[in-house]
Swiss-Prot record:
Strongly expressed in roots and in female and male strobili, and, to a lower extent, in cotyledons, leaves, stems and pollen grains. Residues 1-22 form the signal peptide. SUPFAM superfamilies: Osmotin, thaumatin-like protein (SSF49870). CDD domains: TLP-PA. May be involved in disease resistance. This is Pathogenesis-related thaumatin-like protein 3.2. It holds the Pfam family Thaumatin. Glycans are attached at residue 195. It comes from Cryptomeria japonica. Belongs to the thaumatin family.
């Protein structure tokens, strides 16, 4: 029995260690600011959504351990008093307060908090296309933190005609939905850049231009860092 209990204890140590680490990590604060010369409807998953006129800021708290988090701007929206409506880009099921991810195209600020080696991972992604310029800035002064990343190019004005939609620029994956462009199926483990992804990378070198663009597009900060996301700035 003693040996059995010892075996169980050893098996639980890694889980307990991760749990105890998580206790000391607070929720991250995200300040989301609109510096565009037009109104946007900010969206966050988790977090919901809110209308932001130029200069306004929306602050949300995101629990430690959150994965698959993202922030984006919606444009061309109209909502009724109940919070139902539509957006030209970034729409999330017709809801002002988003309960999930939005529709393409949308420029994304993505993150995963308190992950491997007690790090946050963050990036800007054009895998879902582009609608609004964006920057993401950790507030930490830790030298191990990458710092501000941006995608401030006016991609909409330069978008290839076959990817252009009202208010945005689709990615090739969103436009064609093929294994080659989406890095799925036969291309899942052997997926390189295409002329389309090279276009996006040329406009925003720090951003994901396609699904496997990890090497130059993923950044880290120590867990417990807060972040600022700014549209058009």
């Amino acid at each position: 029995m003693a040996r059995a209990m010892h075996t169980v204890w050893i098996a639980l140590v890694p889980t307990l260690f991760v749990f105890l680490q998580g206790i000391n990590v607070k929720a991250a604060t995200f300040d989301i600011t609109n510096q565009c010369p037009y109104t946007v409807w900010a969206a966050a998953s988790p977090g919901g959504g809110r209308q932001l006129a130029k200069g306004q800021t929306w602050t949300i708290q995101v629990p430690a351990g959150t994965t698959g988090g993202r922030v984006w701007a919606r444009t061309g929206c109209s909502f009724d008093r109940s919070g139902r409506g539509t957006c030209q880009t970034g729409d999330c099921n017709g809801m002002l307060s988003c309960q999930g991810y939005g529709q393409v195209p949308a420029t994304l600020a993505e993150y995963a908090l308190n992950q491997y080696m007690n790090l946050d991972f963050y990036d800007i992604s054009l895998v879902d296309g582009f609608n609004v310029p964006i920057s993401m800035t950790p507030t930490s002064t830790n030298p191990n933190c990458k710092g501000r990343i941006t995608c401030l190019s006016d991609i909409n004005s330069k978008c290839p005609s076959e990817l252009k939609v009202n208010g945005g620029c689709k990615s090739a994956c969103a436009r064609y939905n093929t294994a080659q462009y989406c890095c799925t199926g036969a291309s899942a483990n052997n997926c390189g850049p295409t002329n389309y992804s090279k276009f996006f990378k040329g406009q925003c070198p720090q951003a994901y231009s396609y699904a496997k663009d990890d090497a130059t597009s993923t950044f880290t900060c120590p867990s417990g860092t807060n972040y600022k996301v700014v549209f058009c700035g």
